Each structure stands twice: as C-alpha cells, then as structure tokens.
Regions:
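Active-site histidine-anchored catalytic micro-motif
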Residues: 1-174
Length: 174
C-alpha cells in the first residue's frame, strides 16, 4: 500500500543518513490507509483506538504519518483526547508525494525523530517544514489549516512551539 511504501522510504532514508539517532528502534503500525481528505469519524475512531492500545511506557515518542488536508483537525482532536500524555506524539505530513523533489515529508519525519531523540517534552505536536527551510514544532492544539493557496502551516495566536534541526532542538515556549 502507499502508506507502507512511504513508511519504508522514510525509515530507510533516515537510517542511511548521518544522524545521532540513526539506530533508533522504530515500530510501525498502519491502522488507516486513506487519503486524509477522506478522514471521517469511523477512521478517527480507529486511529484513537490504536493510540489508546499502545503501551506508551515502551516508547520515547509516537509519530503519526498523516495527510495535509485534515492535519490540523486531527492534531486538535488528539490534543483534546490525549492531554496529559506521558510521551510526545507527533503528526507529520508532506506537502507533495515523497518522490517529488519539492516534498518536505522527509524533513518533517527527520525533524520529528530528532525532536523525540533530543528529549521533546510530552504533548501533541506537528512537525512541519515551511518554505523558509525551517522545520517547526507546533502544538497540536494551536495548528491552523494552511491559508488558501499555501502549503504552509502556522500556529494560531502564538509563534510555534519550537524549531528542530539535525544539530539542535530549540523550544520557544515551555
């Protein structure tokens, strides 16, 4: 399936690169395989059930591959239902298919893994690289939908929570 191919490509590329966290153990689950524009209540419930069944104490963080069309909705939903999570839960997406050279999906995946590896505090986040080349961490509860005609994400009412790169995790808010 497309989601399995994307997962494999992201993990393979990350492990091939030089990263302090290249050997991080990654467990993959695929409770949903649909375009995010097709998300509905039964699919969100399937995702929620999967997340509730994960033994959080076994993991440093959870990464959720998600489409951009309903990314802000899912991030806000998870922020409400998983408030008080004991580990960081990050949603990542790509503005284009991963094969497209303009795609930011790998940067978003890498940023999320780097953030978890560098001790990102528990919460719900979206890790997303905008056109300025910076990979931002947004609180899931603050993420807004992309402005019309744009593929960039922003935080409502506040600057983003932080920024992540291969060399550091910079948190603007605590």
């Amino acid at each position: 399936t497309d989601i399995k191919k994307a997962e494999a490509a992201l993990i393979r590329r990350f492990q091939e690169e030089v990263s302090r966290f290249w050997d991080m153990e990654i467990t993959s689950l695929s409770p949903i395989d649909t375009l995010s524009e097709n998300m509905d209540i039964p699919l969100w419930n399937r995702l929620l059930k999967c997340l509730k069944n994960i033994a959080a104490e076994r993991y440093d963080g959870i990464l959720i591959l998600h489409g951009t069309d309903t990314l802000a909705y899912t991030a806000n939903l998870l922020s409400l239902l998983f408030a008080g999570t004991s580990i960081p839960i990050l949603l990542i997406s790509s503005n284009y298919p991963l094969e497209d050279r303009r795609a930011n999906g790998y940067a978003n995946f890498k940023g999320a893994v780097e953030a978890v590896g560098r001790g990102l505090p528990p919460n719900i986040y979206v890790c997303y690289r905008n056109r300025d080349g910076k990979t931002y961490l947004h609180l899931g509860s603050r993420l807004t939908q992309c402005p019309p005609g744009s593929d960039e994400f922003f935080s409502a009412g506040l600057p983003c929570f932080g920024e992540v790169s291969s060399s550091r995790l910079r948190l603007y808010q605590r």
